[in-house]
Regions:
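Bacterial N-terminal signal peptides that target proteins for export
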Residues: 1-8
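Hydrophobic h-region of N-terminal signal peptides that target proteins for export
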Residues: 11-19
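Flexible, low-complexity junctional segments that flank or bridge functional domains
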Residues: 21-328, 335, 399-401, 456-459
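Active-site-proximal beta-strand/loop segments in catalytic clefts of secreted hydrolases
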Residues: 257-261, 296-300, 326-328, 360-364, ...
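Gly/Ser/Thr-rich loop/hinge elements
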Residues: 302-360, 398-402, 412-416, 422-423
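Extended C-terminal subregions enriched in glycine
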Residues: 356-378, 383-391
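C-terminal soluble interaction/assembly domains
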Residues: 367, 386-403, 408-410, 426-432
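Low-complexity, Gly/Ser/Thr/Pro-rich intrinsically disordered linker/tail segments
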Residues: 424, 428-460
Length: 460
């Protein structure tokens, strides 16, 4: 339901806690933005993905018995994702929160299911095309940035659709419609065809040579080894399924490598991962403090934004605004957004580091790696960024299902700095531009970004 960074949630559960609460939540609820409608009956919820012309059932889920202060109801999908609902000011307004998200979603009571849901959109080439094209029209955030006339794209491709269009032809049509975006947070997946389509921003794919899976298995360790051999003093200590790594460059400089913001715990879902992260940070920052710290997210594939906020809290000396998140709120007007949902960085009372920091970034700093970088921008003293622009994808992925069972996703949110700046498409720029893992440097075992970081910290 709604969106979740680099994972798709297709079943949503909202239910009531106990008897008087059940009656207060029973009924139909529509999200502000996100294109979701929820039908609550007792302890069961049915979810629908809705556009102006289509309706696709999204699944069902059940209430779970978790009574936590501030929550009116807690619920769980069949996949194990946890959501909760809380009061929103009136009996016809609530707030829904996905535990892996840094923001909330407003839901409002409506009299009944939309008329378009009386008959779910059929699994035909025409029906699948309508769901795909309308969802993009109503939710994608970057048509103007990508200089795309979506209505024209739809008109051109609709003529290719007939009742006899094959699944392979349909996939190729959909892929061709969104290929020019070169947006890492867009994808199509067809398990029956064993096909999936996703892309990186042009010019940033140079680090990934060939298959993405092969790069993660062999390419990533090879690139990380360049830094380890040239600069790291002794073996790195590892936590959170090796996603958090820490060591020293020298007696004065700590080195924190964050490979992702997900997969921190094999059990316990998001909460289990947060517990594992906090324990790792306790261990790291309970050591004698170095004079300076290098944070390396040059290879970071994203995950859950709140984990990044938790790390930022260990580095903050005072409270500040990390970012404000908005989502497209109108199916026609691209300039209408949901009310801003601010995320604050509040200094943690647990062990941390308040001294000088340099952050290493690059084109494979992706998604939650970028929101983490954005969350560090307001920190005092300033964290100097060294490397290349990040990938330029910040929104959670709005996951959707087609009537034929295929999945697709797109970004529908914008993360804004306190002055309203967003970095979609271009990424966050470094303060000091240095090539990241250039072929010649990798071949010779050099890491010029790390060299520049140490030079800078030596003068702090």
């Amino acid at each position: 339901m709604f969106s979740h960074r680099f994972s798709i949630i297709f079943a949503v559960a909202i239910a009531a806690i106990a008897s008087p609460r059940i009656s207060s939540l029973d009924g139909v609820w529509r999200s502000l933005g996100y294109g979701e409608v929820l039908e609550i009956k007792g302890s069961q919820v049915k979810s629908f993905e809705v556009t102006a012309t289509t309706c696709v059932p999204d699944g069902t889920a059940q209430r779970v018995d978790m009574q936590i202060a501030g929550r009116e109801a807690t619920f769980k999908t069949a996949e194990g994702s946890v959501f909760f609902i809380r009061a929103g000011g009136t009996s016809d307004h609530r707030v829904l929160h996905n535990e892996g998200s840094a923001s909330d979603v407003r839901i409002d009571r409506i009299p009944s299911l939309p008329a378009v849901c009386s008959d779910p959109t059929p699994d035909t080439p025409e029906g699948n095309f309508e769901v795909f094209s309308r969802t993009w029209a109503e939710h994608y955030i970057s048509f103007d940035l990508k200089k795309t006339d979506w209505a024209k794209v739809v008109e051109t491709n609709r003529t290719k659709i007939t009742p006899k269009t094959t699944p392979t032809e349909l996939f190729d049509i959909f892929d061709g419609m969104i290929a020019p975006f070169n947006d890492t947070h867009t994808f199509i997946s067809a398990s029956n065809l064993k096909r999936e389509s996703s892309r990186l921003r042009p010019g940033t794919e140079r680090l990934i040579k060939g298959d993405h899976g092969e790069f993660r298995r062999k390419g990533v360790p090879a690139l990380l080894a360049v830094t380890d051999r040239a600069y790291v003093k002794g073996p790195l200590r590892k936590w959170c399924n090796d996603q958090i790594q820490y060591g020293h460059i020298d007696d004065a400089t700590g080195y924190l490598r964050i490979i992702s913001f997900s997969g921190y715990s094999k059990e316990g879902g998001f909460a289990g991962g947060l517990g594992a992260l906090e324990a790792a940070l306790d261990a790291i920052f309970s050591e004698p403090a170095p004079r300076g710290l290098v944070i390396d997210v040059r290879i970071n594939f994203g995950g859950d934004d709140p984990y990044g906020l938790a790390i930022a809290a260990r580095l903050a000396g005072s409270e500040y605004l990390a970012y404000t998140k908005v989502a497209r709120a109108d199916p026609v007007d691209r300039n209408k957004w949901t009310p801003g949902d601010p995320s604050l960085v509040r200094p943690s009372p647990r062990p941390g580091f308040r001294g000088p920091i340099v952050e290493l970034i690059g084109p494979l700093t992706i998604s939650a790696g970028e929101t983490f970088t954005q969350a560090l921008m307001g920190r005092t003293p300033h964290i100097t960024r060294i490397g290349e622009n990040t990938q330029g994808v910040f929104s959670d992925v709005l996951g959707r299902r087609l009537p034929n069972g295929w999945h697709f996703g797109l970004p529908n949110e914008v993360f804004r700095t306190p002055d309203g700046t967003a970095f979609d498409g271009i990424g966050i720029a470094p303060d000091i531009r240095v090539p990241v893992f250039a072929d010649d440097d990798v071949a010779s075992g050099n890491d010029p970004a790390m060299a520049e970081a140490l030079k800078l910290l030596s003068h702090k």
